[in-house]
Amino acid sequence: MRFATTQLATLACFILTAEATFPLRGLFNDAPVDVDLGVYHEESGNNKEQKVDGFNMSPNIKKRTNENNAANVVSTNGGLFITSTKELKTTVVVTSCFNNVCSETSITTPKTAVTATTSKHSTSKPTYTTTSKHSTSHSSTPASTSKHSTSTSTHPATSEHSTSKSTHATSSKHSTSKSSVSVTTSKHSTHDTTSKSFVTPPASSTTSEHTKHKSHKPSKTVVTLTSCSNNACSQSEITTGAIVVTDKETVYTTYCPLTDTETETESTTATTSKHSTHTTTSKHSSVESTSVTSSSKHSVSKSTDVTTSKHSSSESSHATTMKHSTSKHSTHATTSKHSTTESTSGITSKHSTHATSSKYSTVESSSSFASTSESSVPVSSSKSTTFESSISTTTSKHLTLKSSTPASTLEYSTSIPPAPATTSNSLSTKSTTLTTISRSSTSGSSVPNTTRESSTSTTTPNSSSSESKVSSAIPKYSSSEVSSSATTLKSYSTTHSIPTTLVYSSSTSLGFSVTEFRNLTTTSKSSLSTSTTELLTSGTTVRSSTSESSVTSATSIYTSSESTTSSESTTSIETPKSIASKSSSSVTLPKSSTFAWSTSTTTPESSPITLKLSTSKPPKPSATMESSASTTKNSSIQSTSEATTSGSSGVESSVLTATTKSSVPVTTSEWSSVVTTPKSSAPNTTLEHSTSASETSSGSVYTTFDQSTTVITVTSCSDNLCSKTEVTTGVTVITSDTTSYTTYCPLTGTTTVSSALESLVTANKSTSYVGATPIVSSVVSTTPIISSASTTPIISSASTTSVISSASTTSVISNAISNPVSTDVKPTTSSQGTKSTPVDTDSKSTSETTVMVYTTKSVTPTTVESISVAVSSAAQSSIAAISSYEGTGNNMKLSFGVVIAGVAAFAI
């Protein structure tokens, strides 16, 4: 008995000690057990009950917030657990600044996604010339306005970004022009990408890294918007509504480029506008593509003295100093310098274009062709028009493919009758990128019937590998002299061997592996309109004081017969399967003086392409030169793009002039020169510009389970003109490898307008779907041709470019170049998912940008997990039994010890 009493006393002491040290929580009571399984429950903003599979979840359920306060942890006593995402509203405040006046616009967009992993992208860019985006179309904006960028992104799990792209656009304007846009797009998986730019601001570097975070950590997308105007910048960090319940975090930083205003000085001192554009060379395990667009300058001078226009151009590699300018060109850094001097004695225009080289692994293929011409024509009390045209094609490499393809030969010979007062010299240099620059100056009525044409041919092989070699140039001299009363021209012919270039790269967007063309460069040089579009989309509308011309998808030529200069040029590079496209532009000068520029881009299977363009003038002073252009193409080249084209076959373009009106459908191509019998028996096939790339698509298509549509109305206003564009975007994807980025930088500018001209360019709409996937099946085939409307009497232009690269990546960049000239700019652009309506405003109103967002409700399926937890029957009777107290059993320590002591005493 004594032994039993001792044992009971010992047990009582042990229990009391254990109770003091480790409270018997929940052991002797029926209170619910607090179970933390690490599952997140993100509720809607309201406190309504959520009913899931017959269970009602009371809003009184105990929640515990994790460290980043991004989601709520549901702690119940067992049974059913829910993993879902709450519908969030993202409010992005866009700050627009113009003339030191800023306005803020709020954008609210809901974005939800449930994925497994996401990547962290940390992008750092200079705020002056670089905009870092993901899958974003772009266009140069040389007006003195602010740009606003709104990025809404959904970043799903384990998304591999298989494309690294760099696109640079530089556009210059005769007055109030200092701006440049350089867009660097980097998509990557687990590699480091470094971008270097040799520009006036500090070099920029883009690094991407993947940082592992704790599992089940919800992430938010933070967008930093930077709006700059007149050297004043404002930044705002916005947390977007892309809540992803994953183990990684996504952070984006977007910069809109800085725009500046410079006042033109009409004196003997030149107003210099410097345009700096950097070239980003990205090394990545995927495809790289670099595209460069250089736009030229147009100057008009009214003078009673002799006007001399000098145009010099130099293309070189590895930092060769240019002639007549201080710019240097290299394969990694490009600086364009534009200077214009206006006085009562004449006009001097300088222009330099840049070349960009894209480098990947062991593949590097580049070539260059640049021509320079100088001409001076005496003028007596007449208008002098300076015309510059440049077409820049950037080589793009695909993976580590390499092959040897015969190089095409370009032969350029021009023979012009002599005159005692005019001297024209043509020179050529070579650089690392195929760049063709043509300049001409024609003035007054003293130029009798002068015609000049030049042509450039570029070949693109259709093979899995490409390797180019640049052969040495053999200059040829051909000159013919015809007695003329007022003109003496010298002509030099130079023959260049231009290598073949592989111009396609593979990218993955929303599960689609398509062929993406990055070097679609469209340059129109009668109104300084530059339009760079992606995915086989190229459109430019040129308008001068008496003529308006439009080229959107085909190689159509529009020529006015008035005394002003009109020019168009389109460069179309089709899919690398024996598809040829041509582009040409013509300029009609006073007194039937014509300057024609023709560019032919051909993709042969194996044999080289030889394009010869010869121009000769009969020995009569008043006769018009006959021009002939022969295009030799491989017999295996077929016009196969028309059958698969759905984006621009119905596009119509109209040309409005003061006395001449011409309307040419986009699907019809015309050449300003006479096409003679080529050396080969292959016909001169004309193809449409927009070609479906679905035949080159590869990879699998992932099905999206839900899609939310966000309609953003971008309103761009400039003095007397407002343009509204509705863009449908916002795809909520619940998959495993899709990333969606959307960035907007709407443009505002100033333009003094009158009722001189009106343009209306309509782009056709096309939509294609694959199965039940609510996205575009072929990005290339369904991308509408974007019409770029530009209006100027040579100095000003307004360009609007809209590119829809995919269903989930939609970019709208409105571009306007303005100058105080008497023209009327009313562009109306329409493409897939966009509507543009011109709105008249005050002639003195301050430029402003308004972004409106209409968002449909986003519905995301919930993931239900059933987890078995051993609990008492009382706890299983109701989920609402969970409360915030720990149970009465924790307060029974003293009473339990008293009972044990009493039992021991009773035993004694």
Curated annotation (Swiss-Prot):
Q: Which GO terms describe its cellular component?
A: extracellular region; hyphal cell wall; side of membrane
Bias-annotated ranges (Low complexity): 110-187, 266-324, 332-405, 422-477, 539-608, 639-655, 662-677, 685-700
> Keywords on this record?
Cell adhesion, Cell wall, Glycoprotein, GPI-anchor, Lipoprotein, Membrane, Secreted, Signal, Virulence
Annotated signal sequence range: 1-20
What up-regulates or down-regulates this gene? Expressed in hyphae. Regulated by the EFG1 and TUP1 transcription factors.
Carbohydrate-modified residues are: 449, 462, 519, 634, 684, 764
Lipoprotein keyword on record: yes
Q: Where does this protein reside within or beyond the cell?
A: Secreted, Cell wall; Membrane
Tell me what this protein is called.
Hyphal wall protein 2
The membrane-spanning stretches of this chain are none
- Describe the PTM: The GPI-anchor is attached to the protein in the endoplasmic reticulum and serves to target the protein to the cell surface. There, the glucosamine-inositol phospholipid moiety is cleaved off and the GPI-modified mannoprotein is covalently attached via its lipidless GPI glycan remnant to the 1,6-beta-glucan of the outer cell wall layer.
Q: Lineage of the source organism?
A: Eukaryota, Fungi, Dikarya, Ascomycota, Saccharomycotina
Q: What does this protein do?
A: GPI-anchored cell wall protein required for mating efficiency, biofilm formation, adhesion, filamentous growth, and oxidative stress tolerance. Involved in normal disseminated infection in a mouse systemic candidiasis model.
Can you give the propeptide residue ranges?
888-908
Q: What are its GO biological-process terms? A: adhesion of symbiont to host; cell adhesion; filamentous growth; single-species biofilm formation on inanimate substrate
In terms of superkingdom, the source organism counts as Eukaryota
Compositional bias, Polar residues, is annotated for 406-416, 624-638
Span list, region Disordered: 110-221, 263-477, 539-700, 821-844
List the InterPro entries: Flocculin_t3_rpt
- Lipidated positions per record (GPI-anchor amidated glycine): 887
